[in-house]
Regions:
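Basic, Lys/Arg- and aromatic-enriched nucleic-acid-binding interface segment
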Residues: 152, 165, 169-171, 175-227, ...
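Conserved tyrosine-mediated DNA breakage-rejoining catalytic core shared by Y-recombinases
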Residues: 232-290
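N-terminal DNA-binding module of tyrosine recombinases/phage integrases
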Residues: 21-26, 32-133, 287-299
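C-terminal catalytic core of Y-nucleophile DNA break-rejoin enzymes
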Residues: 38-40, 44, 49-50, 260-284, ...
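Short, polar N-cap/turn motifs at the start of nucleic acid-interacting alpha helices
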Residues: 236-244, 358-377
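DNA/chromatin major-groove-contacting recognition/catalytic segments
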Residues: 255-260, 356, 377, 381-396
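Short, basic (Lys/Arg/His-rich) helix/loop patches that form interaction surfaces
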Residues: 15, 146, 202-213, 272, ...
């Protein structure tokens, strides 16, 4: 075997695996952890070399070699690290197929956002924390809400964690607090005080247009149901035992129309005892219910709440109704009500129950929350009035 060293165009000795192409670019050949040959390239052999005019600047071949050797010694998959962020996110999603339709659509939205952003086509082993932060800033500049960006960041963090577990990369570039990069401009959850709740219902009861929604709003305030659970209620209610059985949601999609989903969380299936106020509201709703179209959705029919066409109401119907209700109320009253959504009634219910001293575990069950932290920290809002009342109670 010849001991003659191969040299480059500058008469420098080349190491094993190194070579120089006719166009002047350096090549390093190595074997990956799967026993397959791989190649890396650079216009520079060592860091002090200058990149030829018109060529993209990059680190030197020797620097790349050092990183590869370190990765191979540590068992890092140098090939896997070359997959793009889009490919990584797709791989992560492929490992969990049994998901709700809303989750699937959320995945599509994030994938589309990645495809339309420079980050999506980046090799995962080139993504640094500064790149992830710049991505968050770009998303904000494009008009994405803070909460949406935070949810997307959480998904990407999980994807990169999988890449770490697979020995494709060493660090997670999404391991940072979004609030350190962007201002959290998420609007606080709006709840109605008991006095506001009373004023709103009094207005609805007398109004020619909104009086027909009175009992539905009462039922929302008395049960704390998610609006999709509320829309899924049917006429098959256990009125004798005064129980609402919650085991599904009714939703509507522009692509497939009405469809049924299981409750949002594993704790979503529950039996809600009806208060006297809720019981009376349901009786009136059943009495005044119009004629329903013959419709079966996911095995369910005879939905309780119908629109003018006799079809089931969905979240969008109530969102529009509540917007109009608040707008009309505020038009004729100086003591304005805050802008709310149907979900605000759920916040209000949870807060009312917490302020009345309901056992946290019982409240968690009634709300169908996944964990107690959500019950206590996310929904239960204290007010100056409730704080004063609680202090007065403790002083007795």
């Amino acid at each position: 075997m010849s001991n003659v060293k191969r040299k480059d165009s500058k008469n420098r000795n080349l190491r094993n695996g190194e070579s120089q192409r006719k166009d002047g670019r350096y090549v390093y050949k190595y074997t990956d952890i799967y026993g397959k040959p791989q190649f890396i390239y650079s216009w520079k052999l060592v860091p002090t070399d200058k990149t030829p005019a018109g060529k993209r600047d990059d680190i030197s071949l020797r620097e790349k070699e050092a990183q590869i050797k370190k990765d191979l010694n540590d068992g890092i998959d140098t090939v896997g690290g070359k997959m793009t962020v889009c490919q990584l996110y797709d791989k992560k999603n492929s490992q969990r197929k049994n998901i709700k339709r809303a989750t699937e659509k959320g995945r599509q939205y994030l994938m589309n956002a990645l495809k339309n952003d420079p980050l999506g086509m980046r090799a995962i082993d080139t993504v640094k924390q500064s790149d992830a932060k710049e991505w968050a800033i770009r998303m904000s500049e494009k008009g994405y809400a803070y909460k949406t960006i935070d949810n997307y960041k959480r998904s990407l963090k999980a994807s990169f964690y999988m890449a770490i577990q697979d020995d494709c990369i060493r660090k997670n570039p999404f391991e940072f607090k979004l609030s350190d990069v962007l201002e959290d401009d998420t609007e606080q959850k709006v709840i109605l005080t008991p006095e506001q709740e009373e004023r709103l219902l009094a207005f609805m009861e007398k109004d020619k247009i909104y009086s027909k929604y009175y009992d539905e709003v009462v039922l929302l305030l008395e049960t704390g149901l998610r609006i999709s659970e509320f829309c899924g209620l049917t006429t098959h209610i256990d009125m004798q035992n005064r129980i609402l059985n919650i085991d599904h949601q009714l939703l509507k999609d522009s692509e497939i129309g009405y469809y049924i989903e299981t409750p949002k969380t594993k704790n979503g299936k529950r039996e809600l005892p009806l208060t006297e106020r809720a019981y009376q509201a349901i009786q009136r709703i059943l009495k005044n219910r119009g004629k329903a179209q013959p419709l079966i959705v996911g095995g369910y029919n005879n939905f309780l709440f119908l629109n003018r066409e006799g079809l089931p109401k969905v979240a969008g119907n109530y969102e529009g109704m509540v917007r109009g209700l608040i707008k009309k109320y505020n038009k004729y009253h100086t003591d304005k009500l805050p802008n709310i959504t149907p979900h605000s009634f759920r916040h209000t219910y949870c807060t009312n129950m917490a302020n009345r001293g309901m056992n946290p575990n019982t409240l968690q069950y009634l709300m169908g929350h996944a964990n107690i932290t959500m019950t206590l920290g996310y929904y239960a809002h204290g007010t100056s009035q409730s704080a004063k009342a609680e202090l007065e109670r403790l002083a007795c």
